[in-house]
Regions:
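Short loop/turn segments at secondary-structure transitions that flank enzyme active sites
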Residues: 18-20, 53, 184, 305
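A general alpha-helix detector
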Residues: 26, 49, 294-295
Length: 348
């Protein structure tokens, strides 16, 4: 596996008409199967620090990380109004943040998903089989519905935080994920809370977008709160929540006439054709389709394009045009010289 190589030069334009020519899209897809943006894991496994972390001090380091994550969640609940950690609002009849940190760390009820409760939005599960990871800090910024007038699309918050030197692990349309790890400091946690409070103040003051994020030239000349409302209205008008949910409902899963390996072999051998994205329904994908963020595969190579999957990717194309500063990178969807999207499918 390659790990963050600087570049690979592909100098084969003179072979463009030869049968052995490998198009850029095919090379890129194959290359991405063997690369990681993370450090080289086998090297990490041999580091002395790794051995140190898994010695007797390991549990203590993770306990400290756990404690910091609890303190951060309590701080967010007490000091912010637009941002809420994804947690049960009430535990044992009290608000989550009213529990003592030591009590929270010992009681799984503070991280439980109860099928009788509505706050988490999940259905179709029973009992106490699911718990939230206590060292993950999932911050919600709103909801797809119109229930909250102050819903803030998280791509905007994510971009702002990156301007402040804070990079979320992952983000969705209304969630931001952070990981509490050994080595995280209280200063680092406070920096995040302060940044979110600054965002809230700018939202309340309806500060001009160009003043709030001056490094992003494509933003409109309107207030932050007005922009958030327009952004949220766009997502609601396109029913983005249901489009996203349909990708992960078992009854909506696409058929897979080919295995991933078979699809990739067809892709390499040339049994492929590029078609406009809007004509993909009913065709077999030869590449994994993955929007980033959040970085989750929405259609795997070998699976068939369905109406739901196509609707979601057409929505993402429209989203990228309306809000280019927040447009996700989409692996598997390509664009020609005119900017029109196309995908690779199994040839007839």
């Amino acid at each position: 596996r390659f790990s963050m190589p600087p570049q690979i030069h592909k100098k084969d334009r003179h072979l463009a008409r030869a049968s052995r020519y490998v198009p850029d899209d095919v090379f890129q897809d194959t290359f991405l199967m063997h690369i990681s943006t993370s450090p080289y894991y086998p090297l990490f496994a041999g580091l002395e620090m790794n051995a140190f972390l898994h010695s007797q001090r390991g549990p203590g380091l993770w306990e400290k990380a756990f404690r910091r994550s609890v303190d951060l969640k309590k701080k967010l609940l007490k000091e912010t109004t637009l941002f809420r950690p994804f947690l049960p609002p009430l535990v044992h009849g009290r608000r989550w943040e009213e529990g003592r940190t030591s009590e929270i760390m010992k009681d799984s009820a503070y991280f439980a998903l109860d099928p009788k409760e509505q706050w988490h939005g999940f259905q179709g599960f029973h009992g106490d089989a699911f718990l939230l990871d206590p060292c993950k800090v999932l911050i919600t910024t709103g909801t797809f519905s119109d229930e909250r007038a102050d819903s803030i699309p998280s791509p905007l918050v994510s971009l702002y935080l990156q301007e402040q030197g804070i990079t979320p692990e992952k983000s969705d349309f209304y969630t931001l994920l952070f990981l509490a790890e050994p080595g995280d400091s209280e200063k680092k946690m406070n920096h995040l809370v302060k940044a979110l409070r600054t965002f809230e103040k700018a939202w309340q003051d309806n500060r001009k977008m160009k003043d709030f994020l001056p490094s992003v030239p494509s933003l409109p000349d309107e207030g932050l709160r007005v922009f958030c409302c327009r952004f949220h209205a766009f997502l609601a008008a396109h029913d983005a929540g249901n489009l996203l949910a349909s990708l992960f409902r078992r009854e909506d899963f696409p058929r897979a006439p080919l295995s991933g390996h078979e699809a990739h072999q067809h892709f390499l051998r040339g049994d492929r054709t590029a078609i406009p994205l809007e004509k993909a329904e009913g065709r077999i994908a030869l590449e994994n389709l993955m929007p980033y963020p959040p970085g989750i595969c929405a259609l795997a190579a070998g699976e068939m394009w369905t109406k739901n999957v196509l609707s979601y990717f057409l929505f993402l194309e429209d989203y990228g045009k309306k809000f280019p500063a927040f447009s996700p990178e989409i692996l598997g969807v390509h664009h020609d010289e005119k900017g029109q999207p196309y995908v690779w499918v199994l040839a007839d």
